[in-house]
Amino acid sequence: MKDWNECFACLNAGLPDDVRRLKEAGYYQLAIARVDALLAEDWAAAQNQPAGAAALPVNPTPQGPDALRAALTAEREILRRLPQVYTLSASQLLAQMQQLVRGFTAEEFAALDAAGAMDWRFVEGEKRYICHAADTLLATHADLAARQLDPPLPLPSWERYEAQHEQMVRTGSASAEITLQAGIGMSDEAFAAALAAARAQGRDAVHVRVWLPLPAACPAQSGIELLSFTEPPAFVAPEDAAQRTAYWEADLTENRRFGAVYRYRSTAHYADPLHTAPDPVQPAFDTEEQLPHLEFTPYLRALAAQLTAGLTDPVQKAKRIYDYVTLNVHYHFQPPYFVQENISDACARSRRGDCGVMAATFIVLCRIAGIPAQWQSGLVARPELAGCHDWAMFYIAPMGWMYADCSAGASMARAGNETMRLHYFGNLDTDRMVANRALCAPFDPPMCAFRADPCDNQVGEVEADGVGLYGEQVVTEQKILEHRYL
Protein backbone atom coordinates (compact mmCIF):
# COMPACT_ATOMS: atom_id res chain seq x y z
CA MET A 1 0.00 0.00 0.00
CA LYS A 2 1.32 3.44 -0.93
CA ASP A 3 2.36 5.74 1.93
CA TRP A 4 0.76 9.04 0.92
CA ASN A 5 2.95 10.93 3.39
CA GLU A 6 5.93 10.30 1.09
CA CYS A 7 4.37 12.77 -1.37
CA PHE A 8 5.48 15.68 0.82
CA ALA A 9 9.11 15.12 -0.18
CA CYS A 10 8.15 16.34 -3.68
CA LEU A 11 6.50 19.61 -2.65
CA ASN A 12 9.45 21.57 -4.05
CA ALA A 13 8.35 20.44 -7.52
CA GLY A 14 5.92 23.33 -7.22
CA LEU A 15 2.48 23.84 -8.69
CA PRO A 16 1.41 24.68 -12.23
CA ASP A 17 0.97 28.44 -12.51
CA ASP A 18 -2.82 28.43 -12.62
CA VAL A 19 -3.10 26.22 -9.53
CA ARG A 20 -0.54 28.33 -7.67
CA ARG A 21 -2.47 31.52 -8.45
CA LEU A 22 -5.74 29.95 -7.30
CA LYS A 23 -4.12 28.77 -4.06
CA GLU A 24 -2.55 32.14 -3.29
CA ALA A 25 -5.86 33.90 -3.98
CA GLY A 26 -7.66 31.48 -1.68
CA TYR A 27 -9.94 29.87 -4.27
CA TYR A 28 -9.39 26.42 -2.83
CA GLN A 29 -12.35 24.62 -4.39
CA LEU A 30 -11.36 25.80 -7.87
CA ALA A 31 -7.75 24.80 -7.15
CA ILE A 32 -8.82 21.32 -6.03
CA ALA A 33 -10.92 20.90 -9.17
CA ARG A 34 -7.95 21.90 -11.32
CA VAL A 35 -5.64 19.49 -9.45
CA ASP A 36 -8.15 16.68 -9.95
CA ALA A 37 -8.23 17.42 -13.68
CA LEU A 38 -4.43 17.40 -13.88
CA LEU A 39 -4.15 14.11 -11.98
CA ALA A 40 -6.73 12.53 -14.30
CA GLU A 41 -5.09 13.79 -17.49
CA ASP A 42 -3.83 11.22 -19.99
CA TRP A 43 -0.59 12.64 -21.34
CA ALA A 44 -0.34 9.95 -23.98
CA ALA A 45 -3.67 11.06 -25.46
CA ALA A 46 -2.72 14.74 -25.32
CA GLN A 47 0.82 14.45 -26.70
CA ASN A 48 1.96 16.37 -29.81
CA GLN A 49 0.66 14.13 -32.57
CA PRO A 50 -1.75 15.14 -35.35
CA ALA A 51 -4.78 12.98 -35.96
CA GLY A 52 -4.09 10.16 -38.38
CA ALA A 53 -0.31 10.55 -38.19
CA ALA A 54 2.02 7.58 -37.98
CA ALA A 55 2.55 6.20 -34.49
CA LEU A 56 5.14 8.00 -32.39
CA PRO A 57 7.30 6.45 -29.68
CA VAL A 58 5.58 5.55 -26.43
CA ASN A 59 5.17 8.63 -24.23
CA PRO A 60 7.81 8.36 -21.45
CA THR A 61 5.50 10.14 -18.97
CA PRO A 62 1.99 8.82 -19.75
CA GLN A 63 0.59 10.33 -16.54
CA GLY A 64 3.08 13.16 -16.12
CA PRO A 65 6.31 13.32 -14.10
CA ASP A 66 6.09 11.32 -10.88
CA ALA A 67 7.44 14.22 -8.80
CA LEU A 68 4.73 16.57 -10.06
CA ARG A 69 1.99 13.99 -9.45
CA ALA A 70 3.25 13.49 -5.90
CA ALA A 71 3.35 17.25 -5.31
CA LEU A 72 -0.18 17.66 -6.67
CA THR A 73 -1.41 14.80 -4.47
CA ALA A 74 0.03 16.39 -1.33
CA GLU A 75 -1.10 19.87 -2.34
CA ARG A 76 -4.65 18.64 -2.91
CA GLU A 77 -4.89 17.58 0.73
CA ILE A 78 -3.25 20.84 1.83
CA LEU A 79 -5.85 22.77 -0.18
CA ARG A 80 -8.62 20.75 1.47
CA ARG A 81 -7.34 21.42 4.99
CA LEU A 82 -6.38 25.10 4.71
CA PRO A 83 -9.94 26.49 5.04
CA GLN A 84 -10.30 24.51 8.28
CA VAL A 85 -7.25 26.33 9.70
CA TYR A 86 -8.08 29.88 8.60
CA THR A 87 -11.62 30.23 9.93
CA LEU A 88 -12.06 33.67 11.54
CA SER A 89 -13.33 36.81 9.88
CA ALA A 90 -11.99 40.16 11.09
CA SER A 91 -15.20 40.83 13.03
CA GLN A 92 -15.07 37.40 14.70
CA LEU A 93 -11.44 37.82 15.76
CA LEU A 94 -12.07 41.36 17.00
CA ALA A 95 -14.99 40.07 19.09
CA GLN A 96 -12.79 37.31 20.54
CA MET A 97 -10.11 39.80 21.53
CA GLN A 98 -12.65 42.14 23.11
CA GLN A 99 -13.92 39.24 25.22
CA LEU A 100 -10.38 38.38 26.31
CA VAL A 101 -8.64 41.76 26.70
CA ARG A 102 -9.85 44.72 28.71
CA GLY A 103 -10.52 47.76 26.54
CA PHE A 104 -9.37 46.18 23.28
CA THR A 105 -10.37 48.46 20.41
CA ALA A 106 -10.92 48.21 16.69
CA GLU A 107 -8.04 50.66 16.26
CA GLU A 108 -5.68 48.29 18.11
CA PHE A 109 -6.85 45.45 15.91
CA ALA A 110 -6.18 47.46 12.76
CA ALA A 111 -2.70 48.42 13.98
CA LEU A 112 -1.83 44.79 14.80
CA ASP A 113 -3.15 43.69 11.42
CA ALA A 114 -1.10 46.32 9.60
CA ALA A 115 2.01 45.21 11.51
CA GLY A 116 1.55 41.59 10.36
CA ALA A 117 0.94 40.31 13.89
CA MET A 118 -1.86 37.95 12.83
CA ASP A 119 -1.58 35.10 10.35
CA TRP A 120 -4.23 35.19 7.62
CA ARG A 121 -5.12 33.93 4.16
CA PHE A 122 -7.82 34.60 1.62
CA VAL A 123 -10.45 31.84 1.76
CA GLU A 124 -12.88 31.79 -1.15
CA GLY A 125 -12.53 35.55 -1.63
CA GLU A 126 -12.62 36.59 2.05
CA LYS A 127 -9.74 37.47 4.36
CA ARG A 128 -9.67 34.84 7.11
CA TYR A 129 -7.44 34.70 10.18
CA ILE A 130 -5.92 31.57 11.68
CA CYS A 131 -8.15 29.89 14.26
CA HIS A 132 -5.74 30.47 17.17
CA ALA A 133 -4.86 34.09 16.30
CA ALA A 134 -6.07 35.33 19.70
CA ASP A 135 -3.79 32.87 21.52
CA THR A 136 -0.83 34.07 19.45
CA LEU A 137 -1.53 37.73 20.22
CA LEU A 138 -1.72 37.04 23.96
CA ALA A 139 1.45 34.94 23.88
CA THR A 140 3.49 37.44 21.88
CA HIS A 141 2.27 40.84 23.15
CA ALA A 142 2.94 41.44 26.84
CA ASP A 143 0.75 44.54 26.89
CA LEU A 144 -2.27 42.52 25.76
CA ALA A 145 -1.51 39.66 28.14
CA ALA A 146 -1.36 42.14 31.05
CA ARG A 147 -4.91 43.28 30.22
CA GLN A 148 -6.50 39.83 30.10
CA LEU A 149 -9.87 39.72 31.79
CA ASP A 150 -9.30 36.12 32.92
CA PRO A 151 -5.53 35.61 33.01
CA PRO A 152 -4.22 32.03 33.11
CA LEU A 153 -2.14 30.69 35.93
CA PRO A 154 1.44 31.98 35.72
CA LEU A 155 3.94 29.80 33.89
CA PRO A 156 6.53 27.97 36.00
CA SER A 157 9.50 30.13 36.89
CA TRP A 158 12.77 29.68 35.02
CA GLU A 159 14.57 29.79 38.37
CA ARG A 160 14.47 25.99 38.64
CA TYR A 161 16.38 25.74 35.35
CA GLU A 162 18.90 28.33 36.47
CA ALA A 163 19.52 26.15 39.53
CA GLN A 164 19.71 23.09 37.29
CA HIS A 165 22.23 24.86 35.05
CA GLU A 166 24.40 25.59 38.08
CA GLN A 167 24.14 21.94 39.17
CA MET A 168 25.15 20.75 35.69
CA VAL A 169 28.17 23.06 35.62
CA ARG A 170 29.17 21.88 39.08
CA THR A 171 28.55 18.12 38.81
CA GLY A 172 28.32 17.45 35.07
CA SER A 173 24.66 16.42 34.91
CA ALA A 174 21.18 16.61 36.38
CA SER A 175 18.46 13.95 36.38
CA ALA A 176 14.75 13.47 36.97
CA GLU A 177 12.50 10.42 37.16
CA ILE A 178 9.22 11.02 35.36
CA THR A 179 6.03 8.95 35.20
CA LEU A 180 3.63 10.01 32.48
CA GLN A 181 0.20 8.93 31.29
CA ALA A 182 -0.64 9.41 27.62
CA GLY A 183 -3.65 8.53 25.54
CA ILE A 184 -5.33 9.08 22.20
CA GLY A 185 -8.56 8.23 20.41
CA MET A 186 -11.35 9.53 18.22
CA SER A 187 -13.64 12.28 19.42
CA ASP A 188 -17.17 11.06 20.04
CA GLU A 189 -18.41 13.19 17.13
CA ALA A 190 -15.82 11.77 14.73
CA PHE A 191 -16.57 8.22 15.84
CA ALA A 192 -20.32 8.70 15.40
CA ALA A 193 -19.77 10.00 11.86
CA ALA A 194 -17.40 7.14 11.01
CA LEU A 195 -19.79 4.52 12.43
CA ALA A 196 -22.69 5.97 10.44
CA ALA A 197 -20.59 5.83 7.27
CA ALA A 198 -19.58 2.23 8.02
CA ARG A 199 -23.21 1.17 8.55
CA ALA A 200 -24.19 2.84 5.28
CA GLN A 201 -21.66 0.51 3.63
CA GLY A 202 -23.07 -2.56 5.37
CA ARG A 203 -20.45 -2.78 8.14
CA ASP A 204 -21.17 -2.68 11.87
CA ALA A 205 -17.78 -1.42 13.10
CA VAL A 206 -15.12 1.19 12.44
CA HIS A 207 -11.66 -0.19 11.72
CA VAL A 208 -9.28 1.94 13.78
CA ARG A 209 -5.48 2.08 13.79
CA VAL A 210 -3.69 4.12 16.46
CA TRP A 211 -0.07 5.18 17.04
CA LEU A 212 0.90 6.62 20.45
CA PRO A 213 4.38 8.10 21.07
CA LEU A 214 6.60 6.32 23.60
CA PRO A 215 9.94 7.33 25.15
CA ALA A 216 12.85 6.29 22.95
CA ALA A 217 16.32 5.19 23.94
CA CYS A 218 18.84 8.03 23.65
CA PRO A 219 21.70 9.46 25.73
CA ALA A 220 19.24 11.63 27.66
CA GLN A 221 16.83 8.79 28.56
CA SER A 222 17.39 5.54 30.42
CA GLY A 223 15.49 3.08 32.57
CA ILE A 224 12.45 3.19 30.28
CA GLU A 225 9.55 1.18 31.75
CA LEU A 226 6.23 0.63 29.98
CA LEU A 227 4.14 0.20 33.11
CA SER A 228 0.67 -0.39 31.68
CA PHE A 229 -1.58 -0.11 28.63
CA THR A 230 -5.32 0.39 28.38
CA GLU A 231 -5.22 -2.83 26.36
CA PRO A 232 -2.32 -4.82 24.92
CA PRO A 233 -0.94 -3.09 21.83
CA ALA A 234 -0.57 -5.03 18.61
CA PHE A 235 3.03 -3.84 18.35
CA VAL A 236 5.53 -1.75 20.29
CA ALA A 237 8.26 -0.23 18.16
CA PRO A 238 11.85 -0.86 19.30
CA GLU A 239 13.46 1.70 21.57
CA ASP A 240 15.73 2.95 18.76
CA ALA A 241 12.88 3.66 16.30
CA ALA A 242 13.15 7.03 14.58
CA GLN A 243 9.63 7.87 15.80
CA ARG A 244 8.77 5.36 18.52
CA THR A 245 5.15 4.35 19.08
CA ALA A 246 2.80 1.80 20.55
CA TYR A 247 0.38 0.58 17.88
CA TRP A 248 -3.19 -0.68 18.22
CA GLU A 249 -5.62 -1.98 15.62
CA ALA A 250 -9.27 -2.71 16.42
CA ASP A 251 -12.79 -2.89 15.02
CA LEU A 252 -14.87 -0.60 17.22
CA THR A 253 -18.62 -0.68 17.66
CA GLU A 254 -18.26 1.73 20.59
CA ASN A 255 -15.71 4.49 20.95
CA ARG A 256 -12.78 4.05 23.30
CA ARG A 257 -9.36 5.56 23.94
CA PHE A 258 -5.94 3.88 23.76
CA GLY A 259 -3.25 4.77 26.25
CA ALA A 260 -0.14 3.93 28.21
CA VAL A 261 1.63 4.76 31.45
CA TYR A 262 5.41 4.83 31.32
CA ARG A 263 8.35 5.83 33.49
CA TYR A 264 11.86 6.85 32.52
CA ARG A 265 14.91 8.69 33.80
CA SER A 266 15.80 11.92 32.01
CA THR A 267 19.41 13.08 32.32
CA ALA A 268 20.80 16.37 31.08
CA HIS A 269 24.56 16.06 30.55
CA TYR A 270 26.55 19.28 30.62
CA ALA A 271 28.46 20.43 27.55
CA ASP A 272 30.55 23.56 27.14
CA PRO A 273 31.10 23.86 23.38
CA LEU A 274 32.43 27.43 23.55
CA HIS A 275 35.40 26.36 25.68
CA THR A 276 36.35 23.11 23.93
CA ALA A 277 38.63 22.98 20.89
CA PRO A 278 37.10 21.16 17.90
CA ASP A 279 39.00 18.53 15.96
CA PRO A 280 40.62 19.77 12.74
CA VAL A 281 38.60 17.24 10.68
CA GLN A 282 34.84 17.01 11.18
CA PRO A 283 32.39 14.29 10.04
CA ALA A 284 30.02 14.76 7.12
CA PHE A 285 27.03 12.63 8.21
CA ASP A 286 23.65 14.35 8.69
CA THR A 287 24.64 17.24 6.44
CA GLU A 288 22.34 16.44 3.51
CA GLU A 289 19.05 17.99 2.43
CA GLN A 290 15.82 16.39 3.62
CA LEU A 291 12.80 17.53 1.66
CA PRO A 292 10.53 19.34 2.06
CA HIS A 293 11.49 21.24 5.21
CA LEU A 294 15.29 20.93 5.19
CA GLU A 295 15.80 22.06 1.61
CA PHE A 296 18.96 24.00 0.71
CA THR A 297 17.09 26.82 -1.03
CA PRO A 298 19.06 29.66 -2.65
CA TYR A 299 17.89 32.03 0.08
CA LEU A 300 18.95 29.71 2.91
CA ARG A 301 22.32 29.11 1.22
CA ALA A 302 22.86 32.87 1.00
CA LEU A 303 21.84 33.34 4.63
CA ALA A 304 24.15 30.55 5.84
CA ALA A 305 27.03 32.04 3.85
CA GLN A 306 26.43 35.46 5.41
CA LEU A 307 26.20 34.05 8.94
CA THR A 308 29.39 31.98 8.69
CA ALA A 309 31.50 34.34 6.56
CA GLY A 310 35.08 34.48 7.80
CA LEU A 311 34.61 31.59 10.25
CA THR A 312 36.44 28.26 10.11
CA ASP A 313 35.67 26.95 13.62
CA PRO A 314 32.50 24.78 13.43
CA VAL A 315 31.56 25.73 17.00
CA GLN A 316 31.59 29.40 16.09
CA LYS A 317 29.58 28.69 12.95
CA ALA A 318 26.93 26.83 14.96
CA LYS A 319 26.94 29.58 17.58
CA ARG A 320 26.44 32.26 14.92
CA ILE A 321 23.46 30.31 13.54
CA TYR A 322 22.04 29.86 17.05
CA ASP A 323 22.44 33.60 17.67
CA TYR A 324 20.63 34.37 14.44
CA VAL A 325 17.62 32.22 15.35
CA THR A 326 17.36 33.09 19.04
CA LEU A 327 17.90 36.83 18.60
CA ASN A 328 15.81 37.38 15.47
CA VAL A 329 12.99 34.84 15.24
CA HIS A 330 9.90 35.79 17.24
CA TYR A 331 7.83 33.03 18.81
CA HIS A 332 4.57 32.68 16.89
CA PHE A 333 1.99 29.88 16.98
CA GLN A 334 1.94 28.13 13.62
CA PRO A 335 -0.59 26.60 11.29
CA PRO A 336 -0.23 22.81 11.17
CA TYR A 337 3.03 21.76 9.53
CA PHE A 338 0.84 19.70 7.18
CA VAL A 339 -0.26 22.84 5.31
CA GLN A 340 3.22 24.41 5.11
CA GLU A 341 5.48 23.74 2.15
CA ASN A 342 8.88 24.59 3.71
CA ILE A 343 8.92 25.69 7.35
CA SER A 344 12.61 26.61 7.53
CA ASP A 345 12.71 28.80 4.44
CA ALA A 346 9.48 30.52 5.51
CA CYS A 347 10.90 31.14 8.99
CA ALA A 348 14.08 32.68 7.62
CA ARG A 349 11.95 35.08 5.56
CA SER A 350 9.27 35.98 8.12
CA ARG A 351 11.47 35.76 11.25
CA ARG A 352 8.72 34.05 13.20
CA GLY A 353 7.95 30.48 14.16
CA ASP A 354 7.29 28.02 16.96
CA CYS A 355 9.74 25.60 18.59
CA GLY A 356 9.75 23.17 15.66
CA VAL A 357 10.11 25.86 13.03
CA MET A 358 13.05 27.36 14.93
CA ALA A 359 14.63 23.92 15.30
CA ALA A 360 14.27 23.16 11.59
CA THR A 361 15.77 26.53 10.67
CA PHE A 362 18.78 25.89 12.91
CA ILE A 363 19.20 22.37 11.49
CA VAL A 364 19.08 23.36 7.82
CA LEU A 365 21.48 26.28 8.29
CA CYS A 366 23.91 24.02 10.17
CA ARG A 367 23.73 21.37 7.45
CA ILE A 368 24.37 23.95 4.73
CA ALA A 369 27.40 25.07 6.74
CA GLY A 370 28.66 21.46 6.89
CA ILE A 371 27.73 20.87 10.54
CA PRO A 372 25.83 17.62 11.24
CA ALA A 373 22.42 18.37 12.73
CA GLN A 374 19.35 16.34 13.66
CA TRP A 375 15.80 16.76 14.86
CA GLN A 376 14.60 15.66 18.30
CA SER A 377 11.16 16.07 19.81
CA GLY A 378 8.49 14.78 22.12
CA LEU A 379 7.15 16.49 25.21
CA VAL A 380 8.07 19.04 27.80
CA ALA A 381 7.49 17.09 31.03
CA ARG A 382 7.51 19.50 33.97
CA PRO A 383 6.11 18.74 37.43
CA GLU A 384 3.07 20.92 36.62
CA LEU A 385 2.33 19.96 33.04
CA ALA A 386 3.23 18.10 29.87
CA GLY A 387 3.14 19.68 26.43
CA CYS A 388 4.54 19.37 22.92
CA HIS A 389 8.08 20.53 22.19
CA ASP A 390 10.79 20.26 19.50
CA TRP A 391 14.49 21.07 19.54
CA ALA A 392 17.67 20.39 17.56
CA MET A 393 20.94 18.50 17.95
CA PHE A 394 24.28 19.28 16.35
CA TYR A 395 27.53 17.30 16.22
CA ILE A 396 31.06 18.60 16.62
CA ALA A 397 34.01 16.29 17.21
CA PRO A 398 35.38 15.50 19.77
CA MET A 399 32.40 16.64 21.85
CA GLY A 400 29.83 14.59 19.94
CA TRP A 401 26.12 15.34 19.84
CA MET A 402 24.96 18.45 21.66
CA TYR A 403 21.64 20.26 21.84
CA ALA A 404 20.22 23.55 20.62
CA ASP A 405 16.82 24.52 21.98
CA CYS A 406 16.27 27.68 19.97
CA SER A 407 12.79 28.51 21.27
CA ALA A 408 14.01 28.25 24.87
CA GLY A 409 17.00 30.38 23.89
CA ALA A 410 14.69 32.96 22.30
CA SER A 411 12.63 33.05 25.51
CA MET A 412 15.80 33.69 27.49
CA ALA A 413 16.76 36.45 25.05
CA ARG A 414 13.38 38.13 25.59
CA ALA A 415 13.90 37.86 29.35
CA GLY A 416 17.41 39.32 29.11
CA ASN A 417 18.94 36.15 30.61
CA GLU A 418 22.13 35.63 28.62
CA THR A 419 23.42 32.87 30.91
CA MET A 420 20.42 30.68 30.18
CA ARG A 421 20.32 31.63 26.49
CA LEU A 422 23.85 30.26 26.23
CA HIS A 423 22.87 27.21 28.32
CA TYR A 424 20.52 26.08 25.54
CA PHE A 425 23.39 26.19 23.07
CA GLY A 426 24.84 22.78 23.89
CA ASN A 427 22.46 21.74 26.66
CA LEU A 428 18.88 20.96 27.61
CA ASP A 429 17.14 20.59 30.95
CA THR A 430 15.76 17.37 32.44
CA ASP A 431 12.09 18.07 31.80
CA ARG A 432 11.74 16.29 28.46
CA MET A 433 10.29 13.14 26.96
CA VAL A 434 12.08 12.17 23.74
CA ALA A 435 9.97 10.14 21.32
CA ASN A 436 11.37 11.25 17.94
CA ARG A 437 14.90 11.58 16.61
CA ALA A 438 14.13 12.29 12.95
CA LEU A 439 11.89 14.60 10.96
CA CYS A 440 9.27 13.07 8.62
CA ALA A 441 10.17 9.50 9.61
CA PRO A 442 7.67 6.66 9.01
CA PHE A 443 6.10 4.72 11.86
CA ASP A 444 6.59 1.02 12.55
CA PRO A 445 4.19 -0.29 11.32
CA PRO A 446 3.72 2.49 8.76
CA MET A 447 0.67 4.75 8.53
CA CYS A 448 -0.22 4.98 4.84
CA ALA A 449 -3.10 7.47 5.10
CA PHE A 450 -2.29 11.15 5.38
CA ARG A 451 -1.14 11.87 8.93
CA ALA A 452 -2.29 14.84 11.00
CA ASP A 453 1.40 15.79 11.14
CA PRO A 454 3.62 14.13 8.52
CA CYS A 455 6.71 15.74 10.08
CA ASP A 456 6.55 15.02 13.78
CA ASN A 457 4.70 12.83 16.28
CA GLN A 458 4.21 14.37 19.70
CA VAL A 459 0.69 13.27 20.65
CA GLY A 460 -0.08 10.42 18.23
CA GLU A 461 -2.08 9.58 15.12
CA VAL A 462 -5.44 7.92 14.44
CA GLU A 463 -6.70 6.30 11.25
CA ALA A 464 -10.35 5.30 10.83
CA ASP A 465 -11.34 3.06 7.91
CA GLY A 466 -8.21 4.06 6.04
CA VAL A 467 -8.58 7.82 6.57
CA GLY A 468 -6.19 9.81 8.74
CA LEU A 469 -7.90 11.99 11.35
CA TYR A 470 -6.79 15.40 12.56
CA GLY A 471 -7.85 18.47 14.51
CA GLU A 472 -11.04 18.11 16.52
CA GLN A 473 -11.53 14.56 15.22
CA VAL A 474 -8.82 13.39 17.64
CA VAL A 475 -8.68 13.53 21.45
CA THR A 476 -5.31 13.28 23.21
CA GLU A 477 -4.00 13.29 26.78
CA GLN A 478 -0.61 13.86 28.35
CA LYS A 479 -0.56 13.89 32.16
CA ILE A 480 2.32 13.91 34.64
CA LEU A 481 1.65 11.29 37.32
CA GLU A 482 4.95 11.65 39.19
CA HIS A 483 8.01 13.84 38.76
CA ARG A 484 11.10 13.66 40.99
CA TYR A 485 14.31 15.62 40.58
CA LEU A 486 17.15 13.30 41.57
Can you name each region flagged by the protein language model?
Residues P314-I321, R351-C366:
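Active-site nucleophilic cysteine motif
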Residues L38-L39, A45:
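Alpha-helical solenoid scaffolds that mediate protein-protein interactions
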Residues L428-L486:
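Low-complexity, Gly/Ser/Thr/Pro-rich intrinsically disordered linker/tail segments
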Residues L15-P16, K23-L30, P238-R349:
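Acidic low-complexity segments
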Residues P50-G52, Q63-Y270:
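Intrinsically disordered, low-complexity N-terminal segments that are enriched in acidic
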Residues A13, D17, R21-A25, V357-M447:
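Hydrophobic/aromatic-rich core segments of domains that either
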Residues K2-G14:
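TPR-adjacent "capping" and linker segments in tetratricopeptide-repeat scaffold/adaptor proteins
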Residues R34-V35:
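Inward-facing hydrophobic residues that define packing positions of alpha-helical scaffold repeats
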